[in-house]
Amino acid sequence: MQYRRFGRTNLKIPVLSLGGMRFQKSWDQLDFSEISYEEQNNVENILNLASKYGLSHVETAKYYGTSEMQLGMGFKNTKKIPNIIQTKIPPNSDPEVFERDVMTSIEKLKVKRIDLLAIHGINTSEHLFQAIKDGGCIDILRKLQKENLIGSIGFSTHGKSSLIEKAISTNLFDYVNLHWYFINQENTKVINLANK
């Protein structure tokens, strides 16, 4: 497996990661009793294979329905906890709600610490403001870092390049998850800025 440094985290992340967006029975938040044995077993089989082949980074999000819960049960049942766990929490104008969402994700994932915590979907100026304002999401995450509940702080986005540049320029984030691939290289300038 090849590895790369992830943003300014100093974490060596595999070039292939295990994305948790489809590790869910439903986009809705369900009780675990509503997950069938077969549905959960599928998640656990994939975790076992991922571990076998060196996929040491798992990424999920609060908005991915039952994904965090199913991955957490999978980590517990298989004892295959990846080296790097990442989840994403949407920004919120109420810092108490945001903090509660982070704590719920830690609980669902059944871990003591989330290595990479991204503010999910900084897609508008309002989202960025909620993240960076005094007493906002970033301040909550800094507090949780001091408590060793989370590691590095980043953001994900489908926003315009100008907004992404503005977020990177705050120097408050350790990494960014964004779209960039062969047929869509619109964010090349932003990637170059992030590499500085």
Model segments located where?
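Short, acidic/polar
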Residues: F32-A50, D94-K110, H158-I168
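Alpha-helix-loop-beta-strand connector modules within alpha/beta enzyme cores
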Residues: E68-T87, C137-N148, K196
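Structural preference for beta-strand elements that scaffold enzyme active sites
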Residues: Y3-R5, I13-S17, L55-H57, P82-Q86, ...
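Active-site groove signature of glycoside hydrolases
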Residues: I106-F129
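Active-site mouth loops of central-metabolism enzymes
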Residues: R22-N41, T87-V97, S125-F129, S156
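Acidic (Asp/Glu)-rich catalytic clusters
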Residues: G7-N10, G72-P82, M103-K112, K166-N171, ...
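N-terminal binding-site loop/beta-alpha segment at the start of enzyme catalytic domains
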Residues: M1-N83
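Beta/alpha (TIM)-barrel catalytic core signal, keyed to glycine-rich beta->alpha loops juxtaposed to Asp/Glu
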Residues: Y3, I122-K196
